[in-house]
A protein has these predicted regions:
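N-terminal organellar transit peptides
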Residues: 1-105, 109-198
Length: 198
């Protein structure tokens, strides 16, 4: 393509497709990260590493995260949520479509961090539900092991969301045992977001 030079893909972004990296890099120069996929180990390259670089640079410009995710890996989601909960620079997080499952946990991480402002469009929805983890037979000896592990995962998700939002234990327990779809207006009231965009 004439006039367009492909950038070399840095080793730390090895999980990013080379074509997508061109757009990824251009947005990073504007301190913007678009996350529009399932949560997996790739968040190390696509979210954590850029956020860490921004946190350690000399700029006071806020970082923008555009989030639209169906959720995914519990462990990878908690990796990012725990990091964001104590992030030391300004972040504008914009939910464009939905933040489901572990993406809702990541969203809730900004509830008590004054550096993070979470915005959503009126048509945005958030989904909270019990976590469920698929384990192979080799990873758990018995069904009881799997159930006990899943219960611990559910409890971790529950405690994290309750501690970072206005969601009470009673409300969570009455809603999250099934698929709990939350509108933008309800999310605002529950401190899952800070602002509804027009």
């Amino acid at each position: 393509m004439e006039g367009f030079e492909f950038l070399a893909l840095p080793e730390k972004y090895s999980g990013v497709d080379i074509v997508n990296y061109q757009y990824f890099h251009q947005l990073l120069e504007k301190r913007t990260i678009v996350f529009n996929s399932e949560i997996s180990e790739d968040i190390i390259e696509t979210l954590y590493l850029p956020l860490r670089d921004f946190e350690n640079d000399d700029s006071d410009e806020p970082v923008t995260i555009i989030l639209n995710s169906v959720g995914g890996s519990v462990s990878d989601g908690f990796f990012l949520a725990n990091y964001l909960a104590s992030y030391k620079k300004k972040i504008n997080m914009i939910i464009t479509g939905y933040a489901a499952s572990m993406a809702a946990v990541i969203l809730s991480a900004g509830g008590k961090n004054e550096n993070i402002t979470r915005k959503a469009y009126p048509s945005t929805y958030i989904l909270i539900h019990d976590g469920y983890v698929a384990l192979s037979a080799s990873e758990a000896k018995t069904a009881n092991d799997i159930m006990a592990f899943n219960n611990r995962v559910d409890e971790n998700i529950r405690n994290f969301i309750i501690s970072n939002t206005n969601i009470t234990e009673e409300l969570y327990d009455s809603k999250a045992r099934k698929q709990w779809f939350i509108s933008a207006q309800e999310a605002l009231e529950l401190n899952l977001i800070d602002e509804i965009m027009e």
